[in-house]
Structure formats: C-alpha cells, structure tokens
C-alpha cells in the first residue's frame, strides 16, 4: 500500500478440480484441516461445476471453490515497482554479485563483491532466498536450507479465459490468469542451486493442461521460467534478527 502500486492485487476465489469425486474424498483429511483453521470451500459437481469456468473441461470432474484467496496479477511488475519505491525513499540498488560477508566480533562489518568492490555496513538484512545459506555461513550461522525448483509457462494467446486461478489437484499444477496471459505452473524439482533448467517439466504441464482441462487451448508455446524457492525441513519461514 505504501508503494501505491495500482491493480496488482486481486481478491478472488480458486477453483480446485479433481478428476473424480473419489480422489477428493481420499484427500478429505487435508480439507478438514483447512476448515478447522477457517479456510472454507464450496463443493461443486455436475451442472453447478460446469457453469463456473466455461473454457475448462469439467466433464465428470469434482470441484471446490476455495474462498478468501488473493493473488498478484503480475509478480514481475510488483518487484519492479517495489524497487522503484525503495529508491524514492532514498535507497540505493547495486547491481552486483556478493562474494562474501566479512564479520568482526560475530557481527557483519563489510560486504565484498565479485568485482572487487566492497561496502562497509552497520546492519545487514539477508533476503537472498535459497542463496542465503551461503552468505550466512560467513557470519557463523548455519541453517538447513534447501532449494526447490518450480517451472511455469506463460502463454500470451492461449484462447482460454479464466476469471480465477484453477488448481488441478489431480495433476499437481495451477493455471492462473495474469497480465501476460495464462500461466501454467507447478512441479517441485529437488536439485542443487543454479541447476541446468529442465524445461521439459514445463512442457509436460502444458500438455497435461490441454489434454485434461483446456481443449480449446490455441497454443502450447510460451515463455518458460524456472524459479528457486527456499525450503526448511519444518516448512516454516526464517524471519527475524540473527542470534
């Protein structure tokens, strides 16, 4: 809100789809856990499900409308405009790669860059995702941080119109309307940091989407992307001051 970024935040519902109701019933325990925490969903099947998203093949499927979701319409624009807001507040953005962090008396004192430059510091915030583990070692902190890689394809001229994200529970991926078109995303790849992308993973998702959800998908080609997200064994985020 402070950055005053317009039309970036969408409050919507999510359509969960299962190929068969039996698959949903087998997954009922997880839905009950959600309900216990105040996360509500409306069950749909037959004609009631068919009228929710006209471009989605719902024949024989079982669905749920999950309420209270929010999503970003363009994460890239969000990041760019947050960076602009940071500079308006007086911040400086250095386009440089950090090689190491120098510390003294167990406190960080200097950031060194791969080009030989360095910057003395009084305080340091490390928000480097999966790469944070490498930097934290320089100041004597070790956390069991692992990288998980996900893939997506953005299709600009898909011929598919969605009013909400569609999470295909039976296929393990999500289809989201974004400013750039239709985004088909999912999978978890366990691999080292900075792996060689295996974009066949993204292609498989698009093929599944066309075969199982979107018979009218005009194109299976689009811009492909791999993203790395940090993962802790207890799945909880690591946020707060260092000890």
Explain the meaning of each model-derived region.
Residues 1-78:
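Rossmann-like flavin
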């Amino acid at each position: 809100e402070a950055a005053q970024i317009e039309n970036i935040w969408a409050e919507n519902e999510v359509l969960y789809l299962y190929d068969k109701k039996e698959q949903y019933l087998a997954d009922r325990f997880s839905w009950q856990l959600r309900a216990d925490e105040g996360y509500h969903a409306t069950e749909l099947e037959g004609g009631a499900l068919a009228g929710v998203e006209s471009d989605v093949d719902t024949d024989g499927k079982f669905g749920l409308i999950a309420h209270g979701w929010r999503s970003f319409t363009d994460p890239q624009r969000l990041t760019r405009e947050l960076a602009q807001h940071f500079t308006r507040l007086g911040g400086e953005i250095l386009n440089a790669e950090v090689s190491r962090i120098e510390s003294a008396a167990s406190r960080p004192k200097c950031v060194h860059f791969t080009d030989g430059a360095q910057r003395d510091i009084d305080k340091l915030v490390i928000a480097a995702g999966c790469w944070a583990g490498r930097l934290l070692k320089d100041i004597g902190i070790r956390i069991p941080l692992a990288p998980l890689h996900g893939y997506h394809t953005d299709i600009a001229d898909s011929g598919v119109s969605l009013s909400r994200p569609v999470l295909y529970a039976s296929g393990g991926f999500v289809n989201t309307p974004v400013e750039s078109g239709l985004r088909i995303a999912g999978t978890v790849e366990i691999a080292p940091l900075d792996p060689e992308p295996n974009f066949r993973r993204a292609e498989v998702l698009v093929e599944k989407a066309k075969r199982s959800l979107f018979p009218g998908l005009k194109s299976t080609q689009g811009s492909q992307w791999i993203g790395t997200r940090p993962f802790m064994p207890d799945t909880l985020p690591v946020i707060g001051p260092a000890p």
